[in-house]
Amino acid sequence: EGCVPTKSLLFCAKQYAHALHGTDFGTTVEGAFYSHEAALKRKDQVVKRLVRGVAASMKANGVCVFQAVGTLRGKADTGEFLVAAGDKSLTASRIILATGSNAVVPPIPGVREGLEAGFVLTNREILALHDAPKTLCCIGGGVIGLEMACYFASIGTKVIVVEMMPKIAGATDPEIC
């Protein structure tokens, strides 16, 4: 839904671009064809491999994982924070709030109806889209939107980006943009 799947798709598209423009570097690839479906399969494999690797790394480093809803329960007498995870009581001196993210759905007329009808997509749906669209309008010029725009444009989709701020990638360093 984010960085790793997007980077995987961008890498696939970059390989396709190398095949198409290889003559610039003395390489000719006859009949280069891009399969968005194959790129999606590779993306899923990369994500699964990364998840397995992270799980193995956490286990090797002694990280305990509790599959449960976590709730803050105040402070213990020791000054540490109390956390309930299912039927377990845990303590920690610091808490990282890392609950994942969801796409922000702005109050733009027609967006909710478009989501329900399936023609408006968040980053979650677009990363699972089996057929690349002929045209795509990306509302939002943030990092994820721009990565999606670049990916789809590089595989032949006509892309338009609409950004309300004075520049795209607004959260980046002004010296970069």
Tell what function each PLM region has.
Residues 1-132, 165-169, 174-177:
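Glycine-rich flavin
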Residues 130-172:
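Rossmann-like NAD(P)H-binding beta-loop-alpha module
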